[in-house]
């Protein structure tokens, strides 16, 4: 019972987010299409974490490479968990409003974005948005229904890239090592006639230090408002790439429509099954529900996904990979809209037991589908 209480408490204060969709010039490219996403929405807090480039425990990916014309308006969509909201009227979708901070976009040139590794890459920044007239980039993303928009520089040279989108939540950043980094990578191909191959290159990990003034910072003024005390906010990392003529640091949102359904390009002859790791169910879903391979696993009431694992194994993997470090950082909401106090709960004794407990529950029982 104690283990159940600990896991329930951790889940109840999870106000995190996952980048999981891309739009190009207003066209939604599809859920998890070309995006390498983890099951877990937990952040990385160690700037020297070996998986700081594209996140850890990546389980959801396909071979899609998204074509992005140089100069295009690009959108990155964030959701509280895979599929979006954790339930109806989820107050923390796409992320808790208290998680103020900047959003940045980096590119790394690769030979084949579909299967490129993330170690040893050289990254250059193409867009950033921080604090502007009291409004944070995260505020704009929430107002846009989870979409963060930026303009891909028109001078970027064509080719395959990994596109790293990073959200930095600063609500607890007054403590060293407590700033929360959320990042995922998309697989893209830049098209056009640009010739700029990047500048101000950095490595991940290695680009940031824990005591950078944009990472170790109290963003609250004396009245508890997240204004950074009226001071300019310094975004970590290098300056973004600029082309002649400049760029728009705060692009306005544009309507996003769904991409046309691609035609089948082969398969097992039936052609009706959803692809591995594709959506196969959920409230309001109208696509295929049969499985070409794998098992349709309910992530929540609104989203089911094809997994090569059994229901039990899939949920065990989700649970165990959600926080590889046994002590779990739990933020307690003590004030209106802000999280001022953090607790560390040691779940080492109960981690495996509770994962088994939750994994054997059917998905229609509360707690059975994490």
Swiss-Prot record:
Statement: the UniProt record of this protein carries the keyword Disulfide bond: yes
Bridged cysteine pairs (disulfide): 155-243
UniProt cofactor note: Binds 1 copper ion per subunit.
Catalytic activities: [(1->4)-beta-D-glucosyl]n+m + reduced acceptor + O2 = 4-dehydro-beta-D-glucosyl-[(1->4)-beta-D-glucosyl]n-1 + [(1->4)-beta-D-glucosyl]m + acceptor + H2O
Any one Gene Ontology molecular-function term assigned to this protein's record: metal ion binding
Record keywords: Carbohydrate metabolism, Cellulose degradation, Copper, Disulfide bond, Glycoprotein, Metal-binding, Monooxygenase, Oxidoreductase, Polysaccharide degradation, Secreted, Signal
Positions of glycan attachment: 329
This protein's record includes keyword Disulfide bond: yes
Sequence ranges assigned to domain CBM1 in this UniProt record: 272-307
InterPro entries: AA9, AA9_LPMO, CBD_sf, Cellulose-bd_dom_fun
GO CC annotations, alphabetized: extracellular region
One Pfam family matching this protein: AA9
GO term, biological process aspect, one: cellulose catabolic process
Tree of life domain: Eukaryota
Top EC category: oxidoreductase
Role according to the record: Lytic polysaccharide monooxygenase (LPMO) that depolymerizes crystalline and amorphous polysaccharides via the oxidation of scissile alpha- or beta-(1-4)-glycosidic bonds, yielding C1 and C4 oxidation products. This leads to the weakening of the architecture of the cellulose fibers. Catalysis by LPMOs requires the reduction of the active-site copper from Cu(II) to Cu(I) by a reducing agent and H(2)O(2) or O(2) as a cosubstrate. In addition to cellulose, displays activity on cello-oligosaccharides and beta-(1,4)-linked hemicellulose polysaccharides such as xyloglucan and glucomannan.
Note on domains (UniProt): Has a modular structure: an endo-beta-1,4-glucanase catalytic module at the N-terminus, a linker rich in serines and threonines, and a C-terminal carbohydrate-binding module (CBM). The CBM domain is essential for binding to and subsequent oxidative degradation of polysaccharide substrate.
Name of this protein: AA9 family lytic polysaccharide monooxygenase H
Source organism of this protein record: Podospora anserina (strain S / ATCC MYA-4624 / DSM 980 / FGSC 10383)
């Amino acid at each position: 019972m104690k283990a159940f209480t600990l896991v329930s408490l951790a889940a109840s204060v999870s106000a995190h987010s996952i980048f999981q969709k891309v739009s190009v010039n207003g066209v939604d490219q599809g859920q998890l299409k070309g995006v390498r996403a983890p099951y877990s929405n937990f952040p990385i807090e160690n700037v020297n974490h070996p998986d700081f480039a594209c996140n850890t425990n990546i389980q959801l990916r396909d071979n899609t490479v998204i074509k992005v014309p140089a100069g295009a308006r690009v959108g990155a969509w964030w959701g509280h968990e895979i599929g979006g909201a954790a339930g109806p009227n989820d107050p923390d979708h796409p992320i808790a409003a208290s998680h103020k901070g900047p959003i940045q976009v980096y590119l790394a040139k690769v030979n084949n974005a579909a299967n490129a590794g993330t170690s040893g890459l050289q990254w250059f920044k193409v867009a950033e948005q921080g604090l502007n007239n009291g409004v944070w980039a995260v505020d704009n993303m929430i107002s846009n229904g989870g979409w963060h928009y930026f303009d891909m520089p028109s001078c970027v040279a064509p080719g395959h890239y990994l596109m790293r989108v990073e959200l930095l939540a600063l609500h607890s950043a007054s403590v060293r090592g407590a700033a929360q980094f959320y990042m995922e990578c998309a697989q893209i191909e830049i098209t056009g006639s640009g010739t700029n191959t990047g500048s101000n290159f950095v490595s991940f990990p290695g680009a940031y230090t824990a005591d950078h003034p944009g990472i170790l910072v109290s963003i609250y003024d004396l009245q508890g408002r997240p204004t950074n005390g009226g001071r300019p906010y310094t975004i970590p990392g290098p300056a973004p790439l600029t082309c002649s003529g400049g760029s728009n640091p705060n692009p306005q949102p544009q309507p996003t429509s769904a991409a046309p359904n691609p035609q089948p390009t082969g398969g097992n002859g039936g052609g009706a099954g959803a692809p591995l790791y594709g959506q196969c169910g959920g409230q309001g879903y109208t696509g295929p529900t049969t499985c070409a391979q794998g098992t349709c696993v309910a992530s929540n009431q609104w989203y089911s996904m094809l997994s090569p694992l059994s229901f039990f194994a899939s949920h065990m993997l989700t649970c165990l990979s959600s926080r590889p470090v046994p002590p779990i950082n739990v933020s307690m909401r003590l004030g209106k809209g802000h999280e001022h106090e953090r607790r560390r709960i040691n779940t080492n004794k109960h981690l495996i037991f509770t994962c088994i407990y939750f994994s054997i529950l059917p998905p229609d029982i509360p707690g059975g589908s994490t």
